[in-house]
Every structure is written in C-alpha cells, then in structure tokens.
Amino acid sequence: MVFQGFNLVDRLTVMENVQSGRLGYISTWSAITRRYPKQDIRRAYELMERVGIAHYADTRADQLSGGERQRVGVVRALMQEPDILLADEPTASLDPKTSEQIMGLLRDLSRELKLPVLINIHNVNEAKEYTDRIVGMRYGRIIFDDKPDMLDPSAMEAIYAGSPHADRSGGPDDKAAAS
C-alpha cells in the first residue's frame, strides 16, 4: 500500500525502508541484522532505478523531499509483489508538480507491470487525467463507475452534493442499485 503520509522510518536509509516491504517474507534474524536476500536487494535496486531514486539507496529517509519519500513508498509497496497496488491519497502531501509526477509514475507502473492500481483520491482533475476508470461513491454507495471522460457536471453533482440524479455507475450493480 502507498500511504498518504509516506509512513517511512526517518532514521533508516532508503534501502532499509524499501526492504521493510519484505519483512513478512524473511526471518526475524535477517530483519534484525539487516541481511536481506540478494534477490530482494537486486529487485529493490531495479525498482528504485525505475522510479529515479537508486542514487539515494544509502540516504536516510528524513533527508528526502516529499516526492522522493513517496517514491520510496511506491517501491516499498511493489517489493511486496502485490496482486493489486492500493494508494491512499498518494499526492495529498505533495506540491502540484510532484503530484503530477507521482500520478504519472503510478499510471506508468500499472501499465508496465500489468498491475491494477486502486487509488483513493479527492482531486478530480488528477483522477480524470491519470486513470482509466473512475468510481465515485457517496455514503458507501457507487454513484458513478465509468471512463474519466464520462464524468460530467451532473455526475459530479450526484457524487458531491447528493442530487437525486439517477445512479450513473454503468457497472454490474446497476440493477441492484436501481431496484
């Protein structure tokens, strides 16, 4: 999972933070002594290179910018070899330019790795620009489920203001929602 607030250990290096994504797969002794399997170190360097932070491998996390910290979080999540990557407000703590870079990175990684990415995000413009599908919910109910270019003002009104407009989900639950 990619967290809104990064959730890095500031006193650890980038590599150590990245390897924390593998803690559930290595022995306690290996974790305590920081003796990570060679294949995990190789994979970490490949991913860090891909997201542009390999040169920070030995840098403490508290020395990084917000965008660099979020990239560490992305690599840590990918080290878990997930079937789906969850991202909770991955751009909330970032400036607009860095937000675009992180959203572009998530989109590109999703396509390259053929990995679904589920992003919880409140920035509608970012959602429209960087995703292939938007699901809008209100009070736990799907109000909209379609391609970004189908998100029009009436759908936005239904999602955010709770207007009585019809459900616009277009998804498999339409019949259940309509009945």
Where is each model-derived feature located?
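Helix N-cap at the start of a conserved alpha-helix in ABC-type nucleotide-binding domains
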Residues: 96-98
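Conserved ABC ATPase signature
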Residues: 60-64, 68
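Catalytic Walker B motif of ABC-type/P-loop ATPase nucleotide-binding domains
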Residues: 85-88
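H-loop/switch region of ABC-family ATPase nucleotide-binding domains
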Residues: 121-122
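Helical segment within the ABC ATPase nucleotide-binding domain
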Residues: 100-112
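Conserved ABC ATPase "signature" region
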Residues: 19, 30-55
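Conserved catalytic motifs of ABC-family nucleotide-binding domains
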Residues: 81
